């Protein structure tokens, strides 16, 4: 199937009598309720369930192996190849399936807040609530922009279309396929809305580096003096929570680009975890869940329609999607200068990493490439308790290119703009998972505040005798004993054994980076 034929098929779909293009938020909410796709909550948000797929399905994600990208993609377990023949046949079947639907919902918008680098996109949805989701998550065009909008990438989403693995070359009924040549994302068999968001992120992670822009899985905010901070970390490590600071303006909560001009948000909304959400803990997120927002897999009371954020009956990966303007202290457009401070967030299930450490450039490169954290319950199917993992660049599932490409760009930018880098453990303290407890959020906020305001630049540090990290001895608002993880363990010998075990895991994982400079290994990694 040629690119021309792909475009003809899209044109027919978009011009069919069933295509509802660029509906407003109230119209989409009405459609969701009329079609019985979701319920209205007491705050006016739409609550929808995603069925059995309550998280991403990494094993069902494919990139079409096309001549133009075959030698650029880092093929493997993350970037699984699928043939053009399989894609073309499945694409044709999905289009025929969607043509028969009474209604289709189309959103046109952008990815990338910096006008110099934004990607015009369109999303064709089988579900109205999915269209509401992308309306809130991506960048919405003005009426004037809409008149000249020409999509450069299209998502075609058909959750109720099930693939046949024996025929379609998939691993299950679900599929998320990206064709860079045809500029199509094809999604089916899963109702999890996050697949649409992350597909566009994966695409930007391919396109932006070609323009010498570092694409990053991070949140970002900016202080009153224009100082920019980045927060890296996988789902559930605290990116959204910790960057929602009442004293700083939010640039974005999850996906950014770093160009020669500075930092820009890739999205136009936020996709926040809301398990155990309360107004007391996270007022910005709690208050953002208003009319037009989307709640995913959140249980609501049948009579009062009040959301119960503590109920994890469906999944722990409950989510809220809302536009940037639902938060008070944001910066719009979502662009800012170069980062002054970079925070690497890790949820260390072994409980041995310090709650905060200062990193040299080499250590920053090492820990960026390592991307150590723990997979937390619910962010992927089948994960019900924390599992130690190394996710390269804190975003391995979304990186189509070789990891060294992103790491080299980060190292260059850290050096050029003199950014200060810190490793922050939001995981366990006083013992490993099951023995210790989760790090106190108030302490984490105090440590990050000290990093942002420059206090940690002048505080005394001690070198960790196993990881070689520089650990501050004093942080305002944090008990000194919390800063040195060994002090929080009752059994000091057990701590040392566990720390050495983790250090060895770091070393074993790093062996896969055979083209990395010796300086990064010798000066950046564990010393014991």
From Swiss-Prot:
BP GO annotations: gluconeogenesis
Pathway: Carbohydrate biosynthesis; gluconeogenesis
Gene Ontology molecular function: ATP binding; metal ion binding; phosphoenolpyruvate carboxykinase (ATP) activity
Highest taxon of source: Bacteria
Residue positions binding ATP: 198, 217, 233-241, 282, 319, 444
Keywords per UniProt: ATP-binding, Cytoplasm, Decarboxylase, Gluconeogenesis, Lyase, Manganese, Metal-binding, Nucleotide-binding
Keyword Metal-binding: yes
Binding site for substrate: 56, 192, 198, 319
EC main group: lyase
Binding site for Mn(2+): 198, 217, 254
Main location: cytoplasm
Textual note on the cofactor: Binds 1 Mn(2+) ion per subunit.
Record-stated family: Belongs to the phosphoenolpyruvate carboxykinase (ATP) family.
Protein name (record): Phosphoenolpyruvate carboxykinase (ATP)
Native species: Bacillus anthracis
Phylogenetic placement of the source organism: Bacteria, Bacillati, Bacillota, Bacilli, Bacillales
This protein's encoding gene: pckA
């Amino acid at each position: 199937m040629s690119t021309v034929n792909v475009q003809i098929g899209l044109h027919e779909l978009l011009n069919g009598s069933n295509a509802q293009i660029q509906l407003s938020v109230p119209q989409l909410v009405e459609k969701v309720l009329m079609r019985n796709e979701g319920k209205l909550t007491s705050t006016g948000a739409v609550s929808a369930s995603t069925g059995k797929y309550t998280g991403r399905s990494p094993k069902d994600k494919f990139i079409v192996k096309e001549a133009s990208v075959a030698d650029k993609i880092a093929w493997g377990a993350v970037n699984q190849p699928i043939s053009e023949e399989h894609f073309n046949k499945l694409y044709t079947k999905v289009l025929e399936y969607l043509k028969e639907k009474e209604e289709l919902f189309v959103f046109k918008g952008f990815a990338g807040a910096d006008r110099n680098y934004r990607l015009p996109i369109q999303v064709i949805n089988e579900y109205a609530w999915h269209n509401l989701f992308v309306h809130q998550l991506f960048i919405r065009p003005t009426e004037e922009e809409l008149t000249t909008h020409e999509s450069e990438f299209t998502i075609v989403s058909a959750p109720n279309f099930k693939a046949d693995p024996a025929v379609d070359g998939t691993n299950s009924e679900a599929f998320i396929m990206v064709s860079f040549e045809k500029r199509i994302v094809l999604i089916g068999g899963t109702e999890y809305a996050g697949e649409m968001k992350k597909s566009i992120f994966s695409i930007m992670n391919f396109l932006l580096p070609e323009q010498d822009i570092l694409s990053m899985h991070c949140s970002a905010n900016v202080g009153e003096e224009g100082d920019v901070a980045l927060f890296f970390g996988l789902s559930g490590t605290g990116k959204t929570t910790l960057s929602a600071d009442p004293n700083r303006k939010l640039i974005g909560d999850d996906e950014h680009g770093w160009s020669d001009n500075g930092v820009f948000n890739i999205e136009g909304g936020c996709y926040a975890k809301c398990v155990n959400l309360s107004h007391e803990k996270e007022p910005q997120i709690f208050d953002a869940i208003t009319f037009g927002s989307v709640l995913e897999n959140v249980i609501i009371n049948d009579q009062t329609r009040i959301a119960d954020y503590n109920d994890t009956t469906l999944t722990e990966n409950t989510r809220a999607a809302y536009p940037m303007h639902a938060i008070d202290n944001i910066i719009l457009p979502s662009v800012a200068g170069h980062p002054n401070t970079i925070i690497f967030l890790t949820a260390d299930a072994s409980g041995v990493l310090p709650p905060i450490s200062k990193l040299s450039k080499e250590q920053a490169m090492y820990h960026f490439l390592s991307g150590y954290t723990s997979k937390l319950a619910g962010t992927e199917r089948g994960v019900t308790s924390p599992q130690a993992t190394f996710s390269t660049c804190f975003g391995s599932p979304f990186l189509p290119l070789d990891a060294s490409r992103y790491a080299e760009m980060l190292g260059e930018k850290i050096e050029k703009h003199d950014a200060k880098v810190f490793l922050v453990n939001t995981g366990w303290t006083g013992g490993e998972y099951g023995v210790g407890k989760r790090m106190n959020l108030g302490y984490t906020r105090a440590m990050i505040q000290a990093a942002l305001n420059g206090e940690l630049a002048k505080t005394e540090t001690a070198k960790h005798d196993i990881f070689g990290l520089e650990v501050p001895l004093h942080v305002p608002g944090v008990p000194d004993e919390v800063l040195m993880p060994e002090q929080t363990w009752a059994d000091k010998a057990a701590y040392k054994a566990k720390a050495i075990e983790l250090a060895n895991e770091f070393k074993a994982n790093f062996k896969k980076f055979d083209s990395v400079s010796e300086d990064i290994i010798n000066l950046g990694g564990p010393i014991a």
